[in-house]
A protein has these predicted regions:
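Glycine-rich FAD pyrophosphate-binding loop
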Residues: 4-6, 15-38
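Predominantly flavin-linked oxidoreductase catalytic cores and closely associated redox partners
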Residues: 6, 16, 20, 99-244
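N-terminal Rossmann-fold NAD(P) dinucleotide-binding loop
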Residues: 10-11
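Conserved N-terminal glycine-rich FAD pyrophosphate-binding loop of Rossmann-like flavoproteins
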Residues: 30-54
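A conserved beta-strand/loop capping segment in the N-terminal third of enzymes
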Residues: 45-97
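Short loop/edge segments at beta-strand edges and connector loops
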Residues: 93-94, 109-111, 249-251
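FAD/FMN-dependent oxidoreductases across multiple families
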Residues: 215-301, 307-309
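C-terminal helical "tail/cap" subdomain of flavin- and related membrane-associated enzymes
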Residues: 300-389
């Protein structure tokens, strides 16, 4: 079994299959899995427990939500008990790879997948080492867990693209305390046009500050679509009194997903996993939990099925059932909210939506933003979700 991509999806699948005695080779183009750790990495507490993640991959816990904007408005929801964690993304990847090794799997880094061909009984995958030397791997199955780049699957049509930049900051303990134990989002066209910003606490004295924007072409909005993210992040630093912070790391990344997830999940013995089959959610940019969930669904099918077409049908059906009807609705809300968020009229529309949340509990906000339980809004939200307001 060849798994291309040692992110949360590929690493978790490798861990599960190696634990069942499967001969697994997990490869990644990165020479070091602690590098390029772009992920806001917030996760609800129940998911941490479900995946059996250890304390070593948890950077901090949170129990509150803070939404700042549009403008200077600020809303806060707090729980007496922890609601979730912020993961150390690099530590998570390293731990999953070590789990794979511990169960007898192999992990090889610095290998980029170039293509594959069908051979008797399986596939021959062509890879290239960082020094340019070619490598060929023969396997019964190949899983493309290479993320939004879809190294082997290739791109489906109608992808919605989100671009993000994140800085890891070193701040004074007093500054860190202001953001501790809460997830903060910055909303509105004066904060991040056609997107949003965030401040997440890491270990004491460290914060993640980031911005993300959707850039699907929109008629009459090219100036917003092409605006670089760097100035927005600098603006956040200044407005949040963080411009004196030390910058420990700078990284960026893409989310590219189809809202309806109606895309090929594989070809023959090549199967897509995680972000490669649009499991990254466009509303809040969440990808880790959904990527790992897709691995949990695929692993038993790879153990049970021998027929590629039947496996792929079952896999796609189970993924669709797992995400449910709320998933495409969350994508529509993301496109409706972020792409339109470029003027005061859009800010006012968002303000009305947020006002409806003020009587909610912190757990209700988690249910909305992590589980997409839009029905808690009631009928008053439907016109907004459907684009009538």
């Amino acid at each position: 079994m060849l798994i291309v991509g040692a992110g949360p999806a590929g690493g978790h699948l490798a861990r599960l299959l190696a634990g069942r005695g499967v001969d697994v080779l997990l490869v990644d183009q990165l020479p070091d899995l602690s590098r390029a750790a772009f992920s806001s990495a917030a996760m609800p507490l129940e998911a941490v427990e479900s995946f059996g993640l250890p304390a070593e991959v948890v950077a901090s816990r949170w129990r509150s939500w803070q939404l700042i904007g549009p403008g200077q408005s600020s809303r806060h929801w707090s729980s007496a008990l922890p609601l979730g964690v912020v993961l150390d993304f690099g530590a998570l990847r390293l731990w999953l790879a070590e789990q794979c090794r511990g169960w007898g799997g192999r992990v090889e880094l610095g290998l980029r997948a170039l293509g594959y061909e069908e051979v008797s009984g399986g596939l021959l995958t062509h890879l290239r080492q960082s020094d340019g030397r070619p490598v060929a791997v023969r396997s019964s199955w190949v899983v493309d867990a290479s993320g939004q780049g879809r190294a082997l699957l290739g791109d489906p049509p109608d992808l919605v693209v989100g671009r993000g930049v994140e800085w890891l900051l070193q701040v004074k303990p007093s500054q860190w305390q202001r953001w501790a134990e809460q997830l903060t989002f910055l909303l509105g066209s004066d904060w991040v046009p056609q997107g949003y910003g965030w401040v997440f606490p890491m270990q004491c004295g460290r914060l993640k500050l980031g911005v993300c924007r959707l850039d699907q072409p929109v008629r009459g909005a090219s100036s917003f679509r092409q605006r670089p993210l760097g100035p927005d992040l600098q603006t956040l630093l200044h407005r949040l009194d963080l411009d004196g912070a030390g910058v420990l790391d700078r990284h960026g990344g893409l989310i590219r997903s189809r809202i309806d997830r109606c895309e090929p999940h594989g070809r023959g013995r090549l199967i897509g996993l995680g972000d490669a089959v649009s499991t990254a959610n466009l509303l809040g940019g969440e990808g880790i939990r959904h990527a790992m969930a897709s691995a949990g669904l695929l692993a038993p099918l790879l153990l049970q099925e021998r027929d590629p077409d039947r496996l792929r049908r079952r896999y796609q059906r189970q993924l669709s059932k797992h995400f449910g009807w709320r998933w495409p609705l969350s994508g529509r809300l993301a496109r409706r909210t972020w792409l339109a968020l470029r003027d005061r009229r859009a800010d006012h529309r968002l303000e009305r939506l947020l006002a409806g949340l003020e009587t909610c509990q912190a757990a209700d906000l988690s249910a909305l933003l992590f589980d997409y339980r839009f029905e808690r809004y009631g009928l008053r939200a439907l016109p907004y979700l459907l684009g009538w307001r």
